[in-house]
């Protein structure tokens, strides 16, 4: 379909990607497929609302977010509900369905100089899901089983809903400064 390179690179105990990767410079892309105009935000990019809005402004009818995310057992918080709500918010604010795919399983972190010689593991919490255009979850996978989830959406009805809300009509990009 095309090339898009991950823009935001995480750097923490689990995801030390800045050591290995350079941020992408392609911007956020959308592609026309046989079924819909789609946008894809890889991993950490999905947490940034600018990613979703950038693709929606380009006409994305469905947003796809493939990722590998987990938080247990070292962190005292389960980040899965927060992750899910962020993706639901991207859907609701842009009136587009979201397909969020996450892996399951465990990765061991071997001691190294880069991680302070810590030994740990990371459990990926699965929970892949599909929303409708308003952010409502229509189907969701479990946390620990490999599963396929799917959903259906009436893209013409979604487009009508986007127009009726006026979110794109009433935007004021000339005053959005960083």
Which residue stretches match the model-derived regions?
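Short hydrophobic alpha-helix segments
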Residues: 2-4, 141
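Active-site beta-strand termini and strand-to-loop segments that position acidic
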Residues: 31-34, 133, 153
């Amino acid at each position: 379909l095309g090339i898009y390179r991950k823009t935001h690179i995480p750097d923490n105990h689990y995801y030390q990607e800045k050591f290995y990767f350079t941020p992408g410079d392609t911007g956020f892309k959308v592609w026309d497929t046989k079924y819909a105009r789609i946008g894809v935000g890889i991993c950490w990019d999905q947490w940034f609302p600018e990613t979703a809005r950038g693709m929606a402004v380009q006409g994305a009818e469905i947003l796809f977010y493939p990722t590998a995310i987990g938080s247990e057992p070292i962190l005292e918080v389960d980040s899965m509900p927060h992750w899910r709500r962020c993706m639901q918010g991207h859907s609701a604010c842009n009136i587009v369905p979201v397909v969020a795919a996450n892996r399951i399983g465990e990765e061991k972190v071997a001691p190294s100089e880069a991680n302070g010689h810590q030994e740990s593991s990371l459990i990926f919490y699965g929970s892949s899901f599909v929303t409708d255009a308003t952010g409502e979850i229509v189907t969701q996978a479990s946390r620990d089983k490999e599963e396929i989830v799917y959903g259906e959406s009436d893209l013409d009805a979604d487009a009508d809903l986007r127009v009726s809300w006026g979110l794109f009509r009433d935007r004021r990009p000339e005053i959005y400064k960083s």
